[in-house]
């Protein structure tokens, strides 16, 4: 897959600061398995997938209005949350 540029993403998001917020929230969803990728994975990491989804117009700033899912997905997450039942 060709590289994703900031300019490709800015066609679908208002500014670069909002792009950081949208991409980071989406990458977190993908990394935790909360959401399925909307583009071909092509062995990309969650951050690249998030940017590719934004550039393709599949993810918009509306993601910022979605509630956070508080799923602990690793023993580190559980340890940091204070849940020691693992």
UniProtKB/Swiss-Prot annotation:
Instruction: Provide this UniProt record's keywords sorted from A to Z.
Output: DNA-directed RNA polymerase, Nucleotidyltransferase, Transcription, Transferase
Xref: Gene3D superfamilies: 3.90.940.10
Keyword Nucleotidyltransferase listed? The answer is: yes
Reactions accelerated catalytically:
RNA(n) + a ribonucleoside 5'-triphosphate = RNA(n+1) + diphosphate
| BP terms from Gene Ontology | DNA-templated transcription
SUPFAM superfamilies recorded: RPB6/omega subunit-like
Q: State which Enzyme Commission number(s) the record gives.
A: 2.7.7.6
- Please give the Gene Ontology molecular function terms for this protein: DNA binding; DNA-directed RNA polymerase activity
**Pfam families reported for this sequence:** RNA_pol_Rpb6
GO CC terms of this entry? DNA-directed RNA polymerase complex
Please describe what this protein does. Answer: Promotes RNA polymerase assembly. Latches the N- and C-terminal regions of the beta' subunit thereby facilitating its interaction with the beta and alpha subunits.
Give the record's family classification. Belongs to the RNA polymerase subunit omega family.
Question: Whom does it interact with, and what assembly results?
Answer: The RNAP catalytic core consists of 2 alpha, 1 beta, 1 beta' and 1 omega subunit. When a sigma factor is associated with the core the holoenzyme is formed, which can initiate transcription.
Name used for this protein in its record:
DNA-directed RNA polymerase subunit omega
Which species is listed as the source? Psychrobacter arcticus (strain DSM 17307 / VKM B-2377 / 273-4)
């Amino acid at each position: 897959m060709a590289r994703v540029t900031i300019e490709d993403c800015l066609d679908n998001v208002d500014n670069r600061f909002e792009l950081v917020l949208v991409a980071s929230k989406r990458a977190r969803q993908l990394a935790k398995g909360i959401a399925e990728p909307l583009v071909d994975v092509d062995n990309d990491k969650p951050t690249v997938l998030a940017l590719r989804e934004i550039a393709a117009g599949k993810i918009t700033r509306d993601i910022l209005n979605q509630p956070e899912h508080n799923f602990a997905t690793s023993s580190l997450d559980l340890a940091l949350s204070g849940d020691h039942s693992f």
